[in-house]
């Protein structure tokens, strides 16, 4: 609960400092329509985020949403990267340089919904490294990184102190282990 409160505090701080206005939130009905069209269900932690922040200029680039502006729409990204839809990966944000942050919905790396980074210039359909153990912690750490220039996610000690569940995910690279 404390991380959740810190997340919304930093979202509002980001919006104030960067003069960002949040777009309208998504809805439960939109999640159901999305799942019917794509066969990819929207997990509860992402629903919680999208009911507040749905396709906004938050972070280093943009966050993605459901039934929002086309360029920030998850379904539009699926038209560009159909492999992601086939794997039931949900893109949740980009880095402003053409790379993306996604969540696996089939629990292939462990329980829950961790967030991983895809470097489209290296391997557009494979995770490059794990970023966070949960969606809300990802957005919290991302915004702290943008606003406060933290050492996330590449500093192992810093990342594990902030995200103690990080190492429970397997079969995916950690950012400090990159070549």
What role is predicted for each listed range?
Residues 31-35, 124, 161:
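Short, charged low-complexity linear motifs
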Residues 42, 53, 57, 139-150:
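A generic secondary-structure signal for well-formed alpha-helical elements
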Residues 100-103, 111-113, 125-126:
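Short helix/loop capping segments that flank catalytic or ligand/cofactor-binding pockets
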Residues 114-146:
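Compact, glycine/acidic-enriched structural inserts
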Residues 147-179:
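Acidic, proline/glycine-rich low-complexity IDRs
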């Amino acid at each position: 609960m404390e991380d959740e409160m810190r997340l919304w505090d930093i979202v509002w701080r980001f919006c104030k400092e960067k003069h960002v206005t949040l777009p309208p939130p998504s809805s439960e009905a939109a999640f159901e329509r999305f799942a019917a069209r794509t066969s990819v269900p929207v997990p509860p932690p992402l629903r919680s985020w999208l009911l507040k922040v749905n396709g906004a200029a938050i972070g280093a680039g943009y966050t993605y949403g459901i039934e929002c502006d086309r360029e920030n729409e998850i379904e539009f990204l699926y038209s560009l990267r159909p492999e992601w839809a086939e794997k039931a990966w949900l893109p949740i944000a980009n880095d402003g340089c053409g790379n993306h942050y996604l969540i696996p919905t089939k629990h292939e790396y462990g329980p829950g919904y961790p967030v991983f980074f895809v470097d489209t210039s290296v391997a557009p359909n494979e995770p490059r490294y794990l970023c966070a153990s949960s969606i809300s912690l990802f957005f919290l750490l991302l915004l702290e990184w943008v606003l406060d220039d933290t050492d996330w996610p590449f500093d192992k000690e810093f990342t594990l102190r902030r995200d103690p569940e990080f190492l429970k995910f397997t079969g995916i690279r950690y950012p400090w282990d990159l070549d």
